[in-house]
Structures are given as structure tokens and as C-alpha cells.
Design a protein with these regions (language model features):
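Non-catalytic, C-terminal membrane-associated alpha-helical segments of glycosyltransferases
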Residues: 9, 13, 222-223, 238-298
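A short, conserved alpha-helix in the catalytic core of glycosyltransferases
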Residues: 156-158, 162-167, 173-201, 208
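Glycine-rich, basic loop-to-helix element that forms the pyrophosphate-binding segment
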Residues: 76-94
Length: 298
């Protein structure tokens, strides 16, 4: 029987929202069972919160409510792992055929899982990405094949053997942002395709401003800036590193902090190994990492 491990890193999430996401997952697994066949599914939550979200009684009730559609496992990390390290911790001993990574605030439509797993039947495909709504990711993709340059891991499925082959996420470099970009590019560097599946829909609960744009928090600004500099360094873009450091040094406190952290890593010899020196995979197009189909308002 084919096996799938679904995993989410949680941090201070509301219990009710997580239960809603689990209920939607149960439905999408049921649809797979009815339309395709048997699939053994494990759902793993890695809790990086300072205080645990679920009690033992909650875990027991969740498994009862899942009614053998899938097994729920709850891991307490005991520290703020970030997404990259959290997913590595959950995935390091995974023996399933496939791994699915989801943000905890993602709600799947019933056929989402079925449609992504169908794409992964192709041995040349390494990862399948769902379409997020209400904010669909703007990056370009081939409308005939679905092939795209990288995937957001808000909702993706990939082959476990590839996760092991490329040694998972680069948690030493990326805490939150750009870990999925780096992960995707290394999958392609290993010879596999990234496929965007627009018919596989995942509702991602981002909070929008009144003008329809997305307003990041201070922590999001810091980790995003830090990751942008480190990604450019790792993927052989020294001019981009210089430019970003200059721009962020003139920015707000969160951006200035990101530059200081980069300089500290440099002094301590903690920067990542530079790869893709011929720029075969990684592309830096201004502030984007591939062509975009549209822009969000700011």
C-alpha cells in the first residue's frame, strides 16, 4: 500500500483553526480512497510553541474522530525550530513513499491531494504544488505541463526519496523564508521537475489589508530580509548580496538587523557553501526569482 506523511510546523496556532484544517484533510483523504484506492496516511504536527497547543486528551480525540482515515501524531519540539528545521525533524525518519508539507492555516479542497499525487506518478517529477487561494502565487508556469521554476511549500507533495537525496531543507541557513525556494532549486539541480497543479486548490488564510494587499509583521520583514541575503549568497549572486545589504542598511530596524546578522555569520564562518556557480538553476530577476504573471498591490 502506498504511504503518505503529511506534516505541519505549528507555533501558537489556535486549536480550533487546527482542528478545522484536520477535518478538511480527512475529507481529502476520503476522496482519494473513493476515487483512487488505498493510501496509508500519517499526519504529523511538530509543535515549536513555548506552550503546547494540544493535550494528550486532544490527541486521543483527534485520532478517534479521524476514524482510521489517517493517524495523527503530535511532536513537541521544546524550542522554536522555524519551518526548515521543524520539517527536517519530522521528515528525518519518514519511511512513507511521499511527504506532504502544509502550512497549518491551509484548508484543502476535497480533491487537492488526489490531483497532486496523480502528477507525481511521472518519474521525472519531484514535487507538486497546489494553487493557493485567495492569494494565488504570481509566479509563472507552463500552462500545458504545469512546470515551474520553484514551489511555495505552503502546500506541496514530493517523493520522500528525493527529500533524503538532497538532505531536506537547509535549516542551518534558512529559518523561515526562502527555505522552499532553495529546496525547490536543489530538487531541480538533482534533475527533477517542479509541477504547479492549478486544479489542486488550497485555501491559505493570509490576512489582507483594506486595499487587498498583504502587510507583513516586523518578524516577517526581518526573516524575509535575512533569507533574501543568504539565498543570494548561497546561489552565487555576490552583486545581489551587496545590493541587498546596501538597501537594507537604509531600511527599518528589522532590515538593518538582518544585515548585521549576515555580517556576523560571515565573521564567524557560518555562511553556506556557494552552489550553482554557472547559474544553471537559480534566477534573480530584481526582487523576484522567476517571471511573474501579475503583481499584488502594496
Amino acid at each position: 500500500m502506498m504511504e503518505l506523511q503529511i506534516q505541519s510546523v505549528i507555533y501558537g496556532n489556535k486549536k480550533e483553526a487546527l482542528l478545522k484544517a484536520i477535518s478538511a484533510l480527512k475529507q481529502t483523504v476520503q476522496v482519494y480512497h473513493k476515487k483512487v484506492g488505498e493510501l496509508k496516511v500519517s499526519l504529523v504536527y511538530g509543535d515549536a510553541s513555548p506552550n503546547r497547543i494540544f493535550l494528550e486528551e486532544d490527541v486521543r480525540r483527534i485520532n478517534e474522530n479521524l476514524n482510521n482515515e489517517m493517524e495523527f501524531q503530535y511532536r513537541i519540539f521544546g524550542f522554536n525550530s522555524g519551518t526548515a528545521k521543524g520539517h527536517n525533524l519530522m521528515g528525518e525518519n519518514c519511511t512513507a513513499d511521499f511527504m506532504m508539507i502544509m502550512n497549518p492555516d491551509v484548508i484543502l479542497e476535497p480533491q487537492c491531494l488526489t490531483r497532486m499525487l496523480m502528477v507525481l506518478k511521472d518519474p521525472k517529477v519531484g514535487l507538486a504544488e497546489a494553487r493557493q487561494t485567495p492569494l494565488e502565487h504570481a509566479k509563472e508556469y507552463d500552462i500545458k505541463t504545469g512546470e515551474t521554476e520553484w514551489a511555495s511549500t505552503a502546500c506541496t507533495v514530493f517523493k520522500t526519496k528525493i527529500f533524503k537525496e538532497i538532505k531536506g531543507f537547509d535549516a542551518d541557513t534558512f529559518f523561515m523564508y526562502c527555505d522552499d525556494l532553495d529546496f525547490s532549486w536543489r530538487i531541480r539541480l538533482a534533475g527533477y521537475k517542479i509541477i504547479y497543479v492549478p486544479s489542486a486548490i488550497a485555501y491559505h488564510a493570509k490576512k489582507l489589508a483594506v486595499d487587498g494587499g498583504w502587510k507583513p509583521t516586523g518578524a516577517e520583514v526581518y526573516y524575509s530580509a535575512e533569507a533574501a541575503i543568504l539565498l543570494a549568497y548561497k546561489w552565487a549572486q555576490p552583486d545581489r548580496v551587496k545590493y541587498l545589504c546596501e538597501v537594507f542598511s537604509r531600511g527599518g530596524e528589522s532590515e538593518k538587523k538582518a544585515v548585521k546578522e549576515f555580517e556576523k555569520r560571515k565573521q564567524e564562518g557560518r555562511l553556506p557553501e556557494v552552489i550553482d556557480k554557472t547559474h544553471k538553476i537559480g534566477r534573480f530577476l530584481g526582487d523576484e526569482y522567476c517571471e511573474m504573471r501579475f503583481k499584488f498591490s502594496k
